[in-house]
């Protein structure tokens, strides 16, 4: 009898513990957190830090126990003034208050980011000496003397047609003797159509049409040409070095007006060239050529042309790490590698020709620190005397004054509040501590920091870094299902590295009774090109072997983590990846919420997918398609799509739904009227919460209208 009572009480305790997660109280708490966990409850945290132009005075806003303050400080004297309003601050600084943003009514007259500029503007372009104007009229180049009637014009070309016309992107040489443009061959465009079912200003639906090139589509072709404005002579470039274009751009005249420098990105992204064309002969030669068996990561490139255009700084991953190189333009050869090592340059802040120095940010320099933490550096152009200007451990954000003498450095970690310091922009020496963030009020509200966690990846050597978010009422005696937030790109690293008072992807969801995690597996950026190019023609990988090992390692350390009960969610590329999780890794991931996913890379935008999946479109696209793999679904799946998604074609989601239905698979489909590219907005968040509570906690969620939101 005694044993039976013990057994019954144990079962009751387990049942009560399970029911405690996903309850109405949990929902109410989850929805309340964004109002409590925010920067209003963080004191001494400078925001919107700026230096006044051409001065050593910097200014910022911060919350204090007495309310919001607007502060101006002099870096030379450390003198400080505090104000109660932005108007008072700007009056003291004698700078104009920024104008309020004008309301936007609709998008009808804006160029959509997917639209290709046809380069047909008819506005005249004036020569540097102010004497002549060049413009396009009837697909041809026309010259006009400033001050004279436009009826008095000189036609420089006559062979322009609708199918092969001269571009209006005209550039004058510095000496005003030449003009450069391109002959442009347009192509037939692809369009995506979608219906706005519930427009705000009318009853009937609206059909939208959007230009949208997809992988494999034909692209425009451009050929540079240069006109001598004195003789009217035209020279046209030979296309041999740029005959398979994805893009041809970044045209710049040399300072001596003898050449035009431009960049060629080959279709398929395995060759990238910086070229130059002679104004006299039209001859094209190569300054820089990058090649890769996988892809040249062109969005990461940086080019700096020296004032006399004799030298050029170029950023490249040619040695596996993202670094800077000095090139001799005339010889087309590397003078020296400026930065080197098993770390990555992240961004160029300034190239100072006068000081012969470069200011930049980088990650991975410090071997004993999180390799994603960003620090700021100064280095000589000869690659010597590299100095860290922001040495404290953490992820840094730096603001420099006009002459780089001072840097305001704010740094933090995902689990550590920010510190803001004033340092020397010359040697990084500490000048003063501006502020140390006070999060005591945040903690009084129950705030719980995420844990930074690392585990070995699939190779058994490489550390995979991520975060673990626990609920505010965390109880280590309970068992917690795991939910992973995924966005694996590629193209960047996505796990937060700086302090965040409220993480929209993890905080509220954890409060329902979950452990929520995020990590960057192989195939993402800033750990070297070999680490990233695992994604090539293989987006279905998405780092899943590393992710599973990471979660299992966390569960091995923390017994309350249930690695046998794992869900996953994401949007956009993360929507594709979360769907892939339950199609190809359904033995590990039991439930997936997938919003606005590019579920088949053949359906998505051309630039993103051809960069990672290559060109021409081949079998790898099919192998990575969630439409093709839909019949492999295991576990629960919720598909979410905004009917007006102008980033990822909504049909991508509908085609997965169609394939799942034909395969006899059960799933949920949520269509959001009037919504663009999204994680789901308020209704989607509600559906996501309920979906995981039902499928991982195995309890019935409270009614939505009973929750205090």
Give residue spans per PLM region.
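A flexible loop/linker signature enriched in serine peptidases of the S9 family
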Residues: 62-69, 89-90, 117-118, 132-143, ...
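Short loop/turn segments that connect beta-strands within beta-propeller blades
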Residues: 75-76, 146-149, 229-232, 279-282, ...
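Bacterial Sec-dependent N-terminal signal peptides
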Residues: 1-26
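Serine-hydrolase catalytic core recognition
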Residues: 257, 263, 395-709
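Blade-terminus and WD-like Trp-Asp/Gly-His loop motifs, strongest in beta-propeller folds
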Residues: 50-56, 124-132, 169-178, 250-259, ...
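Predominantly five- to eight-bladed beta-propeller fold
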Residues: 76-109, 156-168, 181-238, 428-442, ...
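A short beta-strand motif characteristic of beta-propeller blades
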Residues: 35-39, 112-113, 154, 158, ...
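Beta-strand-rich domains and repeat architectures in extracellular enzymes and scaffolds
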Residues: 34-68, 119-126
């Amino acid at each position: 009898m005694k044993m039976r009572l013990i057994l019954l009480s144990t079962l009751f305790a387990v049942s009560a513990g399970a029911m405690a997660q996903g309850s109405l109280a949990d929902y109410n708490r989850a929805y309340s957190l964004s109002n409590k966990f925010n920067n209003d409850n963080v004191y001494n945290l400078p925001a919107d830090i700026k230096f006044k132009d051409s001065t050593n005075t910097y200014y910022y806003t911060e919350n204090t126990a007495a309310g919001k303050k607007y502060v101006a400080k002099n870096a030379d004297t450390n003198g400080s003034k505090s104000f109660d309003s932005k108007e008072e601050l700007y009056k003291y600084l004698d700078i104009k208050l920024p104008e309020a943003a004008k309301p936007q009514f609709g998008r009808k007259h804006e160029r959509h980011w997917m639209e290709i500029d046809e380069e047909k503007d008819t506005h005249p372009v004036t020569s540097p000496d102010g004497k002549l104007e060049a413009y396009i009229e009837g697909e041809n180049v026309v010259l006009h003397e400033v001050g004279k009637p436009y009826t008095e014009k000189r036609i420089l070309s006559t062979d322009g047609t609708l199918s092969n016309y001269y571009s209006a992107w005209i550039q004058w040489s510095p000496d005003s003797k030449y003009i450069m443009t391109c002959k442009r061959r347009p192509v037939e465009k692809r369009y995506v159509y979608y219906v706005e079912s519930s427009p705000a200003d009318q009853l009937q639906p609206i059909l939208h049409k959007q230009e949208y090139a997809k992988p494999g589509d034909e692209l425009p072709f451009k050929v540079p040409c240069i006109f001598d404005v004195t003789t009217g002579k035209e020279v046209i470039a030979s296309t041999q070095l740029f005959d398979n274009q994805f893009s041809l751009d970044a045209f710049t005249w040399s300072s001596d007006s003898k050449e035009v420098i431009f960049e060629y990105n080959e279709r398929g992204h395995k060759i990238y060239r910086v070229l130059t064309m002679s104004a006299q002969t039209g001859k094209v030669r190569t300054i820089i050529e990058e090649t890769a068996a996988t892809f040249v990561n062109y969005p990461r490139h940086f080019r700096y042309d020296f004032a006399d255009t004799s030298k050029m700084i170029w950023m490249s991953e040619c040695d596996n790490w993202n670094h800077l190189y000095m090139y001799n333009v005339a010889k087309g050869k590397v003078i020296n590698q400026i930065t080197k090592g098993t770390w990555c340059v992240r961004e160029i802040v300034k190239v100072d020709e006068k000081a012969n120095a470069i200011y930049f940010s980088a990650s991975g320099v410090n071997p004993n620190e999180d390799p994603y933490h960003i620090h700021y550096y100064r280095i000589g152009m000869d690659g010597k005397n590299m100095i860290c200007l922001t040495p404290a451990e953490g992820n840094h954000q730096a603001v420099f004054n006009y002459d780089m003498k001072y840097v305001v450095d704010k740094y933090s970690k995902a689990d550590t509040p920010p510190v803001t310091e004033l340092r020397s922009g010359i040697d990084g020496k500490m000048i003063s501590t501006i502020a140390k963030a006070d999060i005591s009020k945040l903690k009084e509200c129950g705030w719980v920091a995420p844990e930074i966690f690392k585990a070995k990846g699939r190779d058994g050597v490489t550390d995979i870094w991520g975060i673990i978010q626990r609920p505010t009422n965390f109880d280590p005696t309970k068992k917690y299902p795991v939910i992973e937030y995924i966005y694996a790109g590629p193209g960047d690293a996505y796990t937060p590295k700086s302090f965040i008072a409220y993480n929209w992807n993890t905080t509220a969801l954890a409060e329902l009774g979950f452990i929520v995690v995020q990590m960057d597996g192989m195939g993402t950026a800033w750990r070297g090109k070999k680490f990233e190019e695992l994604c090539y023609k293989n987006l279905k990988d998405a780092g899943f072997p590393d992710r599973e090992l990471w979660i299992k390692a966390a569960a091995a350390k923390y017994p309350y983590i249930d690695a046998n009960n794992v869900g996953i969610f994401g949007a956009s590329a993360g929507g594709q990846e979360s769907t892939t999780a339950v199609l190809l890794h359904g033995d590990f991931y039991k439930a997936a919420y997938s919003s606005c996913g590019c579920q088949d890379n053949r359906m998505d935008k051309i630039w993103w997918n051809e960069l990672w999946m290559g060109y021409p479109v081949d079998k790898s696209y099919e192998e990575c398609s969630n439409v093709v793999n839909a019949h492999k679904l295991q576990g629960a799946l919720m598909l979410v799509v905004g009917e007006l998604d102008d980033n990822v074609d909504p049909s991508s989601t509908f085609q997965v739904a169609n394939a799942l239905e034909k395969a006899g698979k059960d799933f949920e489909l949520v269509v959001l009227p009037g919504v663009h590219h999204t994680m789901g907005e308020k209704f989607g968040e509600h559906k996501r919460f309920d979906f995981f509570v039902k499928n991982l906690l195995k309890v019935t969620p409270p009614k939505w209208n009973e929750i205090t939101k």
